[in-house]
């Protein structure tokens, strides 16, 4: 019985470690963590370390499909990049990441690739309806 319990525990630990490794290796996760998590949180729940000082507070990013489609669309990418600003509220409160990424990455193509990785990552963490 003790051997069985040890085997079950070892299996559970291995499965948990594999799940964490898979989560860390999701394409775009590193980009999300670098550019988005300070405001939107590591879990994309809107509770990043600076969220409390921002007005309006950053939204959770785990239920975007209703607004941006399934899979997440070009519309979301253009919003993140700053290509499209929301008209109802004037300028976006979010940084214009397209400009930031172009300056940092050195080209429009490299910036676009980073944005698409982030959008694909966000698509992978959407809460199922």
Predicted regions and their residues:
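Bacterial N-terminal signal peptides
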Residues: 6-16
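Periplasmic/extracellular electron-transfer cofactor-ligation site
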Residues: 23-24, 29-56, 67, 82-92, ...
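Extracytoplasmic/secreted proteins, especially bacterial periplasmic and envelope-associated proteins
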Residues: 27, 31, 71, 75, ...
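Gly/Gly-Pro-rich "capping" loops immediately C-terminal to redox-active cysteine motifs
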Residues: 29, 45-77, 99-107
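Axial heme c-ligation environment in periplasmic c-type cytochrome domains
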Residues: 58-59, 81-113
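A mid-sequence interfacial segment
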Residues: 106-129
